[in-house]
């Protein structure tokens, strides 16, 4: 006989509430999708006519350059953040120094400090280093923001790691590098990869900091999107927003899948 007690009823109510909240939060995002196919010269919903002209406009070199810059920067940032964030997580978790709490706070501070304050300070520093409007300027700035997205999940994975596996590997003659490659890395890999995806998203979608360090000759997709929204109301931005939304959804789904695929340490 099916359970129809109060707990089941409460669970169903919670599910309905969660679904309604999710719809309320996501509906404004997905309204952009049909607008991107609108044949109108202004934002209108629902569209009266349908066309792919907005997506054809993305062949403009301005949009292509912005997209290539964003993707290239985001990939480099994801790689650098994965390496630096993993090393930082090892130092934070494995070190017994009392200073590690301060180090952790410093690493995570870019996520706490108002982005405008951080961007202004970074802009003044980059002016002296001639990094404003450069590829590596964007990479450095975005990496600072993205490293915490790797440190947090990798630290959590290391804290739950069974250290006896590493000690057993060492007792069998494996060196630190071999132990890390064959024992530690396979266990924390889902955390590293999910952190890398979040770092990629952080860089690809970042606009406030990019506005401080961009130049007329080097800019990212969010910056170009902001320019179009402030200079002229161009419906092409709906197509760009849909493209960004698709990439973000794909990356989030992949990150969630990787995060859920934690290897069983009993099988190692």
List each language-model region with its residue ranges:
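Interhelical loop and adjacent transmembrane-helix boundary motif
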Residues: 4-11, 40-42, 55-62, 204-254
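A structural signal for multi-pass alpha-helical bundles of membrane permease subunits
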Residues: 27-40, 69, 119-129, 197-203, ...
């Amino acid at each position: 006989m099916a359970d129809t007690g109060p707990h089941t009823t409460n669970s169903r109510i919670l599910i309905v509430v969660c679904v309604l909240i999710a719809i309320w939060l996501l509906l404004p995002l997905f309204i952009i999708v049909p607008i991107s196919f609108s044949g109108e010269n202004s934002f209108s919903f629902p569209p009266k006519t349908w066309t792919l002209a907005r997506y054809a406009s993305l062949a403009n070199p301005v949009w292509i350059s912005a997209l290539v810059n964003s993707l290239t920067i985001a990939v480099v940032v994801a790689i650098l953040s994965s390496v630096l964030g993993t090393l930082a997580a090892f130092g934070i978790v494995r070190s017994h120094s009392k200073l590690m709490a301060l180090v952790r706070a410093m690493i995570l501070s870019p996520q706490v400090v108002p982005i405008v304050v951080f961007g202004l300070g970074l802009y003044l520093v980059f002016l002296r280093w001639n990094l404003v409007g450069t590829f590596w300027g964007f990479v450095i700035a975005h990496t600072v923001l993205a490293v915490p997205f790797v440190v947090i999940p990798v630290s959590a994975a290391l804290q739950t790691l069974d250290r006896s596996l590493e000690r057993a590997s060492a007792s069998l003659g494996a060196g630190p590098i071999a132990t890390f490659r064959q024992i530690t890395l396979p266990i924390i890999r889902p955390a590293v990869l999910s952190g890398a995806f979040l770092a990629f998203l952080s860089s690809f979608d970042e606009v406030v900091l990019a506005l401080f360090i961009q130049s007329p000759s080097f800019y990212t997709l969010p910056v170009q999107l902001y320019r179009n929204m402030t200079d002229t109301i161009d419906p092409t931005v709906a197509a760009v927003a849909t493209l960004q939304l698709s990439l973000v959804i794909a990356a989030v789904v992949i990150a969630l899948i990787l995060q859920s695929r934690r290897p069983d340490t009993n099988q190692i």
